[in-house]
Amino acid sequence: MRVVLIVLDSVGIGEMPDAHLYGDEGSNTIVNTAKAVGGLHLPNMAKLGLGNLDDIPGVEPVKPAEGIYGKMMEKSPGKDTTTGHWEIAGVILKKPFDLFPNGFPKELIEEFERRTGRKVIGNKPASGTEIIKELGPIHEKTGALIVYTSADSVFQIAAKKEIVPVEELYRYCKIARELLDEMGYKVARVIARPFTGEWPNYVRTPERKDFSLEPEGKTLLDVLTENGIPVYGVGKIADIFAGRGVTENYKTKDNNDGIDKTISLMKEKNHDCLIFTNLVDFDTKYGHRNDPVSYARALEEFDVRLPEIIQNLKEDDVLFITADHGCDPTTPSTDHSREMVPLLGYGGRLKKDVYVGIRETFADLGQTIADIFGVPPLENGTSFKNLIWE
């Protein structure tokens, strides 16, 4: 038996009860995107029950639905990729990741400069493409590293590969990771951001690399691999979990490549396993850029390919589709939004047309997957296997 778990990165379905604490009242990524484009055409997700979860223009409720459907609330504080994926896998954060709206503390930067032997410029929240345009010429002259953050818990280092070779940049990222951990700063990811080209037309290269914090507890991935069930990551899964519990990981260029790689794994791996896929374009390419038209198109493109995924399920396989947070492209904010996420499920062993309700934590999904595989339970979450299993 195989479980295929697909995370549509940032595809939220309505504000959490505490959204006002995050400045996210009124956010509803799917519904507001549908309104902005005069309706979404998502017939395949509609068949599974998506339209039964909210009033989504263009996506009709279907009775009886062919799948199981519900929504999940986030129990952890935060609204980022790491927090969301860890919680899906059973780890609930007690304390949110540290954010640096005014840049990183002086003593941290000074120690980083000492250990790397290079000066730091920037040290503020910024868009990655803007800051290299602003500071690239100084970096080229002096060899100083461009350090910046964002609305997420990230320490990003940008350098031109002709000035700082990529392997050297990775070494500086490892230094930053060790230093943050030593000094007790809880930063989700240190990210290497190499670029090339000439000012003002610098381009970022594909050698981006994430140095993630390890999950703060045992995840579904750890429990499965410890019990001899491999986990195949597609997209940035290995980065999110700092490589822990991921048997093999397949990097992706874009959503379609992620779907292709997921289907290849379904064709190739005929043993019990978890295929865990993150499709990130919704978030990085369209949500943060407040582009509801392209966001809608990406949702429709995924929906067109959903039947291919379903055709490659064997009789006892299970498919789950969910998200990790919101990123409403119609609100003034370009940041993530604190939202509930949709949950859709389908498989030969699952009942049809079952509403699993609004789950209190994303961890209910991880716990259910552990239950389906018959491995020891996770620390958090309540399994709903009994509601959905034939």
UniProtKB/Swiss-Prot annotation:
One of the record's GO molecular function terms: magnesium ion binding
E.C. number: 5.4.2.7
Principal localisation: cytoplasm
Binding site for Mn(2+) 2: 283, 288, 336
One Pfam family cited in the UniProt record for this chain: Metalloenzyme
InterPro entries, alphabetized: Alkaline_phosphatase_core_sf, DeoB, Metalloenzyme, Phosphopentomutase_DeoB_cap_sf
Cofactor: Mn(2+)
Catalytic activity entry: 2-deoxy-alpha-D-ribose 1-phosphate = 2-deoxy-D-ribose 5-phosphate; alpha-D-ribose 1-phosphate = D-ribose 5-phosphate
Class in the EC hierarchy, top level: isomerase
Signal peptide per UniProt: none
CDD domains reported for this sequence: PPM
Pathway given in the UniProt record: Carbohydrate degradation; 2-deoxy-D-ribose 1-phosphate degradation; D-glyceraldehyde 3-phosphate and acetaldehyde from 2-deoxy-alpha-D-ribose 1-phosphate: step 1/2
Subcellular location per the Swiss-Prot or TrEMBL entry: Cytoplasm
Amino-acid positions noted as binding Mn(2+) 1 in the UniProt annotation, renumbered to this chain: 9, 324-325
UniProt keyword annotations, A-Z: Cytoplasm, Isomerase, Manganese, Metal-binding
Family: Belongs to the phosphopentomutase family.
Protein purpose: Isomerase that catalyzes the conversion of deoxy-ribose 1-phosphate (dRib-1-P) and ribose 1-phosphate (Rib-1-P) to deoxy-ribose 5-phosphate (dRib-5-P) and ribose 5-phosphate (Rib-5-P), respectively.
Record-given protein name: Phosphopentomutase
Organism expressing this protein natively: Thermotoga petrophila (strain ATCC BAA-488 / DSM 13995 / JCM 10881 / RKU-1)
Taxon lineage: Bacteria, Thermotogati, Thermotogota, Thermotogae, Thermotogales
Gene name of the record: deoB
